[in-house]
Amino acid sequence: MATIVVAMSGGVDSSAVAAMLHEQGHHVIGITLQLYDYGIAVGKKNACCAGKDIYDAKMVANKLGIPHYVLDYENKFKESVIDNFVNSYLHGETPLPCVQCNKLVKFRDLINTAKELGADKLATGHYVRKINGYNGAELHTGLDAAKDQSYFLFTITREQLEYLIFPLGGFTKYETRKLASKFGLDVADKPDSQDICFVPDGNYKTVINKIRPEASTSGKIVHINGFELGEHSGIINYTIGQRRGLGIAYNEPLYVVKIDPSNNIVYVGQESALHVHEFIIKDVNWLADEIKDNEKLAVDVKIRSTRPPCHAEISKLCNDKIKVQFLSAEKAVAPGQACVIYAGERVLGGGWITRNIR
């Protein structure tokens, strides 16, 4: 049997993984990362990093009789994730902090810690599958499409993927809860996390204004045809595709279509102005063979975790960025979000949306 470290968040998924591996006879070690000021977050029920989650993880470990460690990563989390989140909004982007956390904190440091403990593998409760392919490990979507989390894991490296295991990849959420109940875990009916862990009340603007008070500097709201319509209360209050809360009167519905942080301008226009045919992604991470120069590849892409994949064609640009061309125009492609590239159920890679070419 193997020594396996389980990343325990205190939720039902990772708790079920720890119990399952323990029952199989593996030597299981639980690790929970303290990422935020839990004194503030205590009592928050819908975020993955609330203080009670550490307690829940510890209680599960005690019930199973496995060692459990809590690692304090608050400073690194602030520098790598929270500051990035704030800066992204100030640059007119719509950030995705959970992916940055996976890349810069969770997987990198958990894998290093697991290896220091002599573990053979690191297990998580993500709903994705690792499949041994001809050229090594491949990342595939979870069998439960409603819970698939592959979109959030595109930044892991091939080397990291070889070391990781995802025992819930073939499970549905119902089956996971049933398994946790079978093991008598108190977290079996615990609600799923919803909020960003460092946004206690779901209002990210409060967090940004606390760190960067200048974020609420007012500016102009301008129609894409060039005329001024009103004043905004800070670009952090707006995201691409937004319709509600613009505070301007017009004879037809208007949407945020562009944010210009350099000039502190929010541009609005009709819904048709949101349609995008192609865009550029940067900082691409490949979990399959990288696309070649002058090659065009037909793929599926996801531009939001909640959206279904859509058909596209990708090609490599001279600066190692990737151009993504939709077969049919898509709405509200937001810079700062991730674009994950698929071939069927396999994750080929992904990158960060940097700009749109309408």
Curated annotation (Swiss-Prot):
Per the record, the coiled-coil ranges are none
Enzyme Commission (EC) number: 2.8.1.13
Molecular-function GO term, any one: ATP binding
> In terms of one coarse class, where is the protein primarily found?
cytoplasm
Q: Which GO terms describe its biological process?
A: tRNA wobble position uridine thiolation
Q: Name one Pfam family in it.
A: tRNA_Me_trans
The protein's matches in Gene3D superfamilies, at most eight in alphabetical order, are given as: Adenine nucleotide alpha hydrolases-like domains, HUPs, Translation factors
Write out the GO cellular component annotations. Answer: cytoplasm
| Cystine pairings recorded for this chain | C101-C197
Q: Which domain of life is it from?
A: Bacteria
Active site location:
C101 (nucleophile), C197 (cysteine persulfide intermediate)
Kindly list the places in or outside the cell where this protein is found, as annotated in its UniProt entry.
Answer: Cytoplasm
Membrane-crossing ranges are none
Catalytic reaction list: S-sulfanyl-L-cysteinyl-[protein] + uridine(34) in tRNA + AH2 + ATP = 2-thiouridine(34) in tRNA + L-cysteinyl-[protein] + A + AMP + diphosphate + H(+)
The broad enzyme category this protein falls into is transferase
Q: Where is this region: Interaction with tRNA?
A: 147-149
Q: What keywords are annotated for this sequence in UniProt? A: ATP-binding, Cytoplasm, Disulfide bond, Nucleotide-binding, RNA-binding, Transferase, tRNA processing, tRNA-binding
Quote the record's binding site residues for ATP.
Answer: A7, M8, S9, G10, G11, V12, D13, S14, L33, G125
| Record-stated family | Belongs to the MnmA/TRMU family.
* Protein name (database record): tRNA-specific 2-thiouridylase MnmA
What's the source species for this entry?
Rickettsia typhi (strain ATCC VR-144 / Wilmington)
> What taxonomic ancestry is recorded?
Bacteria, Pseudomonadati, Pseudomonadota, Alphaproteobacteria, Rickettsiales
The gene behind this protein is: mnmA
